[in-house]
Swiss-Prot record:
Disulfide bonds: none annotated. The keyword Hydrolase applies. The active site is at 165, 262, 292. It comes from the Bacteria. SUPFAM superfamilies: alpha/beta-Hydrolases. Gene3D superfamilies: alpha/beta hydrolase (3.40.50.1820). PANTHER family: AB HYDROLASE SUPERFAMILY PROTEIN C4A8.06C, ALPHA_BETA HYDROLASE FOLD-3 DOMAIN-CONTAINING PROTEIN-RELATED. This is Acetyl esterase. One of its GO terms (molecular function) is carboxylic ester hydrolase activity. Keywords: Cytoplasm, Hydrolase, Serine esterase.
Length: 319
């Protein structure tokens, strides 16, 4: 779409979202738009430090988990000794950015609000890792903790997956992978999905929205996809285009959160409408005035905190 035809998003977002957009970090260098992926990853980690400050303190442990691809870092957040369930968190970042530090506050708040153990999985980023490596690493970590639950003193009888953006796709894809391959890692009580992409190649919101403010232009989305997938055929895989999977049966209860001015919003709407049409347990909530990635900004945005509380409440209601 011709850029002039897109919605004037920055004029339409909420007051608290505008405050976030206008928040300057004077010690931060400019975004290395023409830099290497390594430079962009470093910048992303630095930029997120401010937004991760002030998170709840709790017992935190780090473990390296073996997979067929090598060791994968995990981080456990334990808000109480006797957790009712374990939530696996997959960070966003377009498959190419992000780590356990960039999403630390999100995971801590989710653990605090749910009172469940949260395990962040630092899956290998793309393009170093190609589809389906990240999913297989997540599944391997889930199996590992299920087998070692007593040693790590965690409750793996009931589990869940949660993620934002690309992490939301990985969360649902991992749950479907376990279902389809009949892998027992405990009962999947729920899946929490914040503004994910699930397989649409075009949509109204992808046309009307997306720009330099969110890194989600059509060109950006194509770049993330090309970095993540191994070949063109992967675009139709039921673990990438999740609408090609069977969404009519045995889908764990899904909390689907949408951001009003997110180009990926139609992915969330379609996922909800598909699941609801086939009587699969699901809930959709739209957060007005928000941009993609708003979950990071709970230091300033009540809406971000609300979205995390909503997800935690949905999950605990399934237990």
């Amino acid at each position: 779409m011709k850029p002039e035809n897109k919605l004037p998003v920055l004029d339409l977002i909420s007051a608290e979202m505008k405050t976030v957009v206008n928040t300057l970090q004077p010690d931060l260098p400019s975004w290395p738009a023409t830099g290497t992926i390594a430079e962009q990853r470093q910048y992303y980690t630095l930029e997120r430090r401010f937004w991760n400050a002030g998170a709840p303190e709790m017992a935190t442990r780090a473990y390296m988990v073996p997979t067929k691809y090598g060791q994968v870092e995990t981080r456990l957040f334990c808000p109480q000794p006797d957790s009712p369930a374990t939530l696996f968190y997959l960070h966003g970042g377009g498959f190419i950015l992000g780590n356990l530090d960039t999403h630390d506050r999100i995971m801590r708040l989710l653990a605090s609000y749910s009172q469940c153990t949260v395990i962040g999985i630092n899956y290998t980023l793309s393009p170093e890792a190609r589809f389906p490596q990240a999913i297989e690493e997540i599944v391997a970590a889930c199996c590992y903790f299920h087998q070692q639950a007593e040693d790590y003193q965690i409750n793996m009888s009931r589990i869940g997956f949660a993620g934002d953006s690309a992490g939301a796709m990985l969360a649902l894809a991992s749950a479907l992978w376990l279902r389809d391959k009949q892998i027992d890692c405990g009962k999947i009580a729920g899946v929490l999905l914040w503004y994910g992409l699930y397989g649409l190649r075009d949509s109204v919101t992808r046309r009307l929205l997306g720009g330099v403010w969110d890194g989600l232009t059509q060109q950006d989305l194509q770049m993330y996809e090309e970095a993540y997938l191994s070949n063109d055929a992967d675009r139709e895989s039921p673990y990438y285009c999740l609408f090609n999977n069977d969404l009519t049966r045995e889908v764990p209860p899904c909390f689907i959160a949408g951001a009003e001015f997110d180009p990926l919003l139609d992915d969330s709407r379609l996922l909800y409408q598909t699941l609801a049409a086939h009587q699969q347990p699901c809930e959709f909530k739209l957060y007005p005035g928000t941009l993609h990635a708003f979950l990071h900004y709970s230091r300033m945005m009540k809406t971000a905190d609300e979205a995390l509380r909503d997800g935690a409440q949905f999950f605990t209601a399934q237990l």
